[in-house]
Every structure is written in C-alpha cells, then in structure tokens.
C-alpha cells in the first residue's frame, strides 16, 4: 500500500470569530492541534485615518483619534493634544491637567475592565463580563456628563479641555471609587485563584524581556516581562509627576502575569483618580480649564454675546482654524494598551502636513506568530486576549 503524504492543516480563525475581538483574520497552520504558523491578515477595518487628517484643520482632525482605540477614546486624544500643544508652545492650566489625568485614568479602567473580563470569557468564564460591564456603564455615564458623548468624546482639545466639570460630577466620581475596589476584589476572588483560569493562562504566551524590546512591545506587554517601563513615570506628562502610584511588574511574562498586572493597574488608576478628585474639589476648585489664548482656544459663549472681537475669533477658529508653526514633534502617552504616539509634521498651515499614529496594538499583533508557535489551538484565543487588541487602532 502506498504511503500517503501527511500535510499540515490550514484553517481560518475569523474574520468574524467570537474570540477574535473584532475583525481579525488569522490563517493558522496546524500539525494536529499544535500551531506551526500564525499569519494575521489585517486591514479589514482600514479607513485611511492618517490621510483623512491631512485634509482637516487641527481641531477637525481631533475626532478621528477617538475612533482608533474606541474602548478608551480620550487617551488617544490626549497624545494628539499634547503634540499640537508642543508645536504651538502653549501650556495647559493646572485644573485642565487634572481633568485630563482624571479622564485618562477612567479610560484605563474602561479598557482593563473590558480586557480582563473578556479574557476570562475567552477561556470559558461567563460571570466576569457581566460584573465588568456594570462598572463600565457607570464610567460611560461620567464620560457622557463631561462632554455629552459616551464613546467618541472629542473632549480633550489642544490647549486644555472643552469645558469645565460641574462639582457634582467630580463628587460623584469620588463616590464611585470606594465601591469599585469591592467590585475589583470580587473579580479577583472569582478569577485569580480559579484552577481552570490558571491552567489556561500560566506559562502560555511567554515573552522574555529582550524579545519584548525587540518586537517593539510597550505597556503591559513589557511590564509583564519584568521592566518597570511606564511613560507616566519614565517620561512624565501633564501632572503625573505629582501623583502617587505604583507600577506593577510581572516576572514570568505569561498571560497570567499580564492579567494580574491589569488588575493591579485598575487599583492604581483608582488611586490616581482619588488624588485628582481631592484636588479638583480642594486646592484647584476654581480656575481655567484651557489656555487663555483666544487665537487657539475659542472664547466662552457669554463673552461672544458681549464682544464683537470674541465673535470674530470664534468664527475664524471654526472656519479656517489656527496656523501651527512649521516643525515636527513626537508626543506619546501611556495608553491602556501601551505607548500610543503621535508624530505630527506641520508645514505652517492650518492643517497637519502628516500625522503618523503609533498604535501599540499593531506592534503586539505582529508578534502573534512568535507567541503562538508550539502552543495548542485552544491557547491562541488565550494569547490573543492577553495582547489586548482593538482593530480601530491596528488598521487605522
């Protein structure tokens, strides 16, 4: 009897797979149930964001940033606003900085709650997402009360934030923090010691530190491998250098370590939020929330009713926009998924000449083949969950 040639088996994972978190398509080459090769096919959500931004004024380009990592929108706006501010050479008043930091940390918790609970769901735990989404709903309401939108906020503007927060809202955010620790402890008790969750995540998708640097990882992916690299501490922006918080780091670099770091980061974010709330209700209770330069920040409604000059400024800002001095700048923030950077090139006009977006998820997804080789097919979704990928920013 003639021998039959045994070939590896190719399957498609996605593009509409429940564990793929969006429009991911992986072409997997399997030897039995062991993964030999992973080929991510991206671009299914490509919208040409970077090109579209070149046709808009600096203010009009801002909402595109919300639509990248749409799980934590304000963190992307933050990087863009910082880049424009550096080119313009303007600074943000203290109250505006505190509001930005407060909402950036809310974004981090929004992101980690979604990731940790869906990571648990990917390996078969159905309760955590229900608990996580209950807390996310409350945070979305805080987003809505600040700017009117639950997701695409367009709240951070170059020069500060769009409008001040009412005291009642800041108080409500303060009241939310302590009960949130209870929710986190409940999640912790449910998932962390769970035997099945551990078996599915411990020693899966291990990344050594030198590999993490070589692949261009950032955020949790680097901290899970043992480096205390967090832009909020290593290259502080806004008022992070005045905040007290710790950077959790892992030592095994596996999926379980990355999960534990995200859990601890939510606690640290809540600590930062508590400090912001205390300052916003105390020492910084009154004060401007955006730069006073009316050539960049539009005047207030009441001012426009009284002053013709203010009306003209407002009209010019929303039709022509402001001209940014020629130059180039790179601004990066510690977004929930890693280092989100904006490389902005200005030619002196009212529109960006080029805006390159450095999405952390893009660098993490490219290592999918490296991470999954030799693992079982079932581990692919566990590894994917621990990478924390959102396709808005990968495909741009």
Curated annotation (Swiss-Prot):
InterPro entries per UniProt: NADH_Q_OxRdtase_suD (IPR001135), NADH_UbQ_OxRdtase_49kDa_CS (IPR014029), NDH1_su_D/H (IPR022885), NiFe-Hase_large (IPR029014)
Catalysis performed (reactions): a quinone + NADH + 5 H(+)(in) = a quinol + NAD(+) + 4 H(+)(out)
Bilayer disposition of the protein: Peripheral membrane protein
GO MF terms held by the record: NAD binding; NADH:ubiquinone reductase (non-electrogenic) activity; quinone binding
Keyword Lipid metabolism: no
Domain of life: Bacteria
Subunit note: NDH-1 is composed of 14 different subunits. Subunits NuoB, C, D, E, F, and G constitute the peripheral sector of the complex.
Protein name: NADH-quinone oxidoreductase subunit D
Organism: Brucella anthropi (strain ATCC 49188 / DSM 6882 / CCUG 24695 / JCM 21032 / LMG 3331 / NBRC 15819 / NCTC 12168 / Alc 37) (Ochrobactrum anthropi)
């Amino acid at each position: 009897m003639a021998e039959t040639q045994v070939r590896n088996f190719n399957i498609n994972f996605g593009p509409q797979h429940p564990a793929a978190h969006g429009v991911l398509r992986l072409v997997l080459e399997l030897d039995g149930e062991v993964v030999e090769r992973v080929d991510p096919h991206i671009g299914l959500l490509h919208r040409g964001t970077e090109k579209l931004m070149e046709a808009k004024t600096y203010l009009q380009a801002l909402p595109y940033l919300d639509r990248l990592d749409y799980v934590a929108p304000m963190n992307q706006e933050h990087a863009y606003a910082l880049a424009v501010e550096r080119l313009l050479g303007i600074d943000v008043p203290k109250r505006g900085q505190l509001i930005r930091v407060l909402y950036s940390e809310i974004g981090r918790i929004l992101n980690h709650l979604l990731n940790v609970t869906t990571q648990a769901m990917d390996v078969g735990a159905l309760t955590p997402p229900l608990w996580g989404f209950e807390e996310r709903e409350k945070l979305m309401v805080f987003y809505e009360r600040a700017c009117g939108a639950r997701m695409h906020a367009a709240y951070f503007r170059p020069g500060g934030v769009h409008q001040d927060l009412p005291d009642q809202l800041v108080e409500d955010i303060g009241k939310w923090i302590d009960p949130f620790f209870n929710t986190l402890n409940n999640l912790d008790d449910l998932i962390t010691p769970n035997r099945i969750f551990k078996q599915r995540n411990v020693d899966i998708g291990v990344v050594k530190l030198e590999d993490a640097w070589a692949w261009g990882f950032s955020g949790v992916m680097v901290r899970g491998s043992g480096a205390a690299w967090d832009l909020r501490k290593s290259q502080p922006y806004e008022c992070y250098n005045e905040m007290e918080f710790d950077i959790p780091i892992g030592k095994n670099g596996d999926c379980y370590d990355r999960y534990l770091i995200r859990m601890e980061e939510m606690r640290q974010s809540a600590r930062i939020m508590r400090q912001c709330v205390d300052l916003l209700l105390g020492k910084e209770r009154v004060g401007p929330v955006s730069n006073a330069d009316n050539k960049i920040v539009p005047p207030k409604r009441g001012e426009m009713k009284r002053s013709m000059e203010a009306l003209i400024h407002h009209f010019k800002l929303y039709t022509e926009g402001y001209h940014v001095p020629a130059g180039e700048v790179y601004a990066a923030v510690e977004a929930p998924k890693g280092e989100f950077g904006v490389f902005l090139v200005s030619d002196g006009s009212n529109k960006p000449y080029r805006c390159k977006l450095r999405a952390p998820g893009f660098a993490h997804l490219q290592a999918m083949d490296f991470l999954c080789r030799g693992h079982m097919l079932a581990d692919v979704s566990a590894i994917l969950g621990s990478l924390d990928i959102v396709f808005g920013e990968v495909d741009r």
